[in-house]
Amino acid sequence: STGMSNIKEIKQAVKILTSEKLPKKNLFILHCNTAYPTPYEDVNLRAINQLKRDLKLTVGYSDHTLGVEVSVAAVSLGAAVIEKHFTLNKNWKGPDQKSSLDQGEFENLVTSIRNIEKSFGSKIKKITNSEKKNIYFARKSIVAKKNIFKGEVYSYNNLTTKRPAGGLSPMLWKKFLFKKAKFNFRKNEKIR
């Protein structure tokens, strides 16, 4: 845990540990603020990226804030390990009881982190299976903004795009703009 430390001190500690033959794969650095509870404005989650970049080690987060949101955010920023204190009773005496989680909160934290991990995906932007069924409904078609008569020139004044798909894709807009209509079209009819 790196609470109450600056980057120079953290690098010195890592150097000492690795000089003692501790394999780097067994060394985890946890970004931390040692205030109980830590004010949100002092969390500085962006330091996780600095630790990863500068130390080239597995980096996590030791959370002393109230609630679970900051731990979940840390995971979304690349924290590979989360440490959060657990208590059976928040009313017990001790410096960290208020910022510790009870059983229900801890279960919520784990569920939230697992959901965030699932949401990371593959790094490739593609149409997912869950959204394929909405392609027809959510995509648009080129349609007549008003009645268009055969021979009339397509323009910004008489064409628009609307849901659903099934007609010409808006990607073809420039191909039709300023060309003559080959058919009559009623207002909101898909152009073909």
Predicted regions mapped to residue ranges:
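Catalytic cores and adjacent flexible loops of soluble metabolic enzymes
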Residues: 2-192
